[in-house]
Amino acid sequence: MPQVTMRQMLEAGVHFGHQCRYWHPNMAQYIFGARGKIHIINLEKTVPLFNDAMNYLSSIAQKRGTILFLGTKRSARASIKEEAERCGMPFMTQRWLGGTLTNFRTVKQSVARLKELEAAETDGTFDKLVKHEVLSLRREREKLDASLGGIKEMNRLPDAIFVIDIGHEDIAIKEAKKLGIPVIAVVDTNYNPNLVDYAIPGNDDAIRAVQLYARAAADAVLEGKAAAPNSASVREEEFSAESADEGKGRRAPAKKGEKKADAPAAE
């Protein structure tokens, strides 16, 4: 799969951490030093961890799994939405709704309501209502779409979550950990990398850095999908195998006019 280089990370500002006074001790192994009271992240540590995380995302996509892209902070919203849509994965870019994972059944009911309102707006139902009713329903639809539009096709819990800022998305990460859902996340110098399954030490604020992470994640997903076995060919192979097994257990019928072998005479 395409690998992100150290030069690309340097150009995107991935190596710039937070102010030294806000650092988390568990990030010490990933910190190269400090410059002007700002911690500098050791990209020699980041690059292999980043590529490992991307390989993991690709492996999930290859198994036809679902990865939820999560980035609700202002600097992450546009990139997360764009790249998630590009690779066909669900996303959340507005405020995380508590219980999105742990109370998924209720969330699915809200998604069903959103789809119902979208259908009503296009099938002529709204045309039969008075103006104030239409305005009320449209406001409801817009509110639901803003919070749940990115996950309306996510019919089950995701197989993993890709997160930009673990401090900003702490509730989502707690829900994922409670349910045993793997978390792949960018972790800046001010947070604990041990809170996630695949930590990517790096700047979680710079727009260019976020674009790099999101684009690479989407590329990994697309590559995994491309490597997934074709369902039609899998069924064809299974059918061929079953036919071969059945053929082994059958005896070819005797040709016309050919006598069957006589049974051995009893002694």
Swiss-Prot record:
MF terms in GO: structural constituent of ribosome
Recorded superkingdom: Bacteria
Keywords in alphabetical order: Ribonucleoprotein, Ribosomal protein
Region of interest (Disordered), residue spans: 226-267
Family annotation (Pfam families): Ribosomal_S2
Bias type Basic and acidic residues, positions: 245-267
NCBIfam families registered for this protein in UniProt: rpsB_bact
Entry-linked PANTHER family: 30S RIBOSOMAL PROTEIN S2 PROKARYOTIC AND ORGANELLAR (PTHR12534), SMALL RIBOSOMAL SUBUNIT PROTEIN US2M (PTHR12534:SF0)
The protein's name in its UniProt record: Small ribosomal subunit protein uS2
Species of provenance: Xanthomonas oryzae pv. oryzae (strain KACC10331 / KXO85)
Lineage, uppermost ranks: Bacteria, Pseudomonadati, Pseudomonadota, Gammaproteobacteria, Lysobacterales
Gene it is expressed from: rpsB
